[in-house]
């Protein structure tokens, strides 16, 4: 699996240390193991997880501005866990409302010795925003409109929303409230992945 990951990273133009690669593989192995009992993801093959979960998450890293992030509706830690491994200087709060997912995240935190994550079981609407976050990240969580509506209290004055999407979500962008503006839409290149991937970066026009 290390050879496959190394090859994928090379194709993506991403450089990681051996320690980071080993952490990513350990995470995939844990996800594969726990998935049998906890049904954390529909992806069953660890090699497929490398593409659809690991690469699909870490290609976003260069576009994240700031040091404090919250991954809302993180599920089994996607994209938060892979991002925390490739951005060790940043801190990631991993938020999910389901206890079994948060238990898995805490086990990952323990086994991988990840000191820059905080798994939290909570609904996003009820989660406090102090101190505010530099970035609110979501992957397959909600429409853009619902994301900014439910998470409006989380980013700071210079904070941004980062929504990982498949096809270009033009309809969702058109429905955004006027107090939010799309700062950029990045077409992501994920090696060996079928289908399109886009990152939508949204800024609140906070006065």
Swiss-Prot record:
Q: Which residues cross the membrane?
A: none
Its chief place of residence is cytoplasm
Annotated residues that bind S-adenosyl-L-methionine are located at 73, 78, 124-125, 139
Q: Which GO terms describe its cellular component?
A: cytosol
Q: What is its EC number?
A: 2.1.1.170
Leader sequence segment: none
Q: Which InterPro entries match?
A: rRNA_ssu_MeTfrase_G, SAM-dependent_MTases_sf
PANTHER family from the xrefs? Answer: S-ADENOSYL-L-METHIONINE-DEPENDENT METHYLTRANSFERASES SUPERFAMILY PROTEIN
Protein name, UniProt field: Ribosomal RNA small subunit methyltransferase G
